[in-house]
Regions:
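Active-site and donor-binding regions of nucleotide-sugar-utilizing enzymes
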Residues: 6-182
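Nucleotide donor/acceptor-binding cores
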Residues: 2-4
Length: 184
């Protein structure tokens, strides 16, 4: 039996990035889901209150359309299987049942500037990371590895408090293919 991987998608950038990463892991049983949450945020999403986020129905619909058009297996909410590995582009929200699996976090792109909300979220665990946006990516420490774009980003995340032993410089699939733009 092949080991199972769940790819947690979101925006189209995140979704296409997860798809590209999956190409290198063809020996695994791969499943995909739009971004989701549990608890209060999950309920708010179900009620349509988070349409401005990657948990909104419109963005989830776009992700699902893309995944279906590429014949990828869907597991909406990641509850069909016990996954050996979860690959995601954000740890701002980590659903409880995902925490039972090994997680690889992949940097999606640039991070937002550090504001007072960043410092609150970093210094007080009761302040949710999502309130500070992408400036707090990597601070959950719920992952086995955090794949980042460059040495510069590695240094940035370390300065924010990310465990250096968990960071791997791998580049970012959607932004590291200059050759495809030679004939645009």
């Amino acid at each position: 039996m092949r080991k199972k991987i769940l790819f947690v998608c979101g925006s189209m950038n995140q979704t296409t990035q997860m798809h590209q990463i999956s190409w290198y892991l063809g020996e695994y049983d791969q499943w995909f889901t739009p971004f989701f949450s549990d608890g209060l945020l999950g309920k708010a999403s179900d009620m349509g209150m988070l349409e401005f986020t990657i948990m909104g129905k419109k963005r989830a619909g776009r992700a699902i359309d893309y995944l279906v058009s590429n014949n990828l297996q869907l597991d909406i909410g990641g509850a069909l299987h016990n996954y050996d590995l979860v690959v995601t582009c954000t740890d701002l929200i980590v659903p409880k049942h995902i925490k039972r699996s090994k997680i690889v976090l992949v940097q999606e792109g640039m991070t937002e500037p550090e504001t007072i909300l960043f410092h609150l979220a970093r210094n007080f665990r009761w302040v949710p990371r999502w309130i500070a946006g992408t400036s707090t990516i990597g601070l959950s420490d719920t992952y086995e590895k955090f794949c980042v774009a460059s040495e510069g980003y590695r240094d940035l995340f370390i300065s924010k408090g990310v465990n250096p032993d968990k960071i791997e410089v791998t580049s970012i699939p959607n932004f590291d293919d200059c050759e495809r733009y030679l004939q645009n």
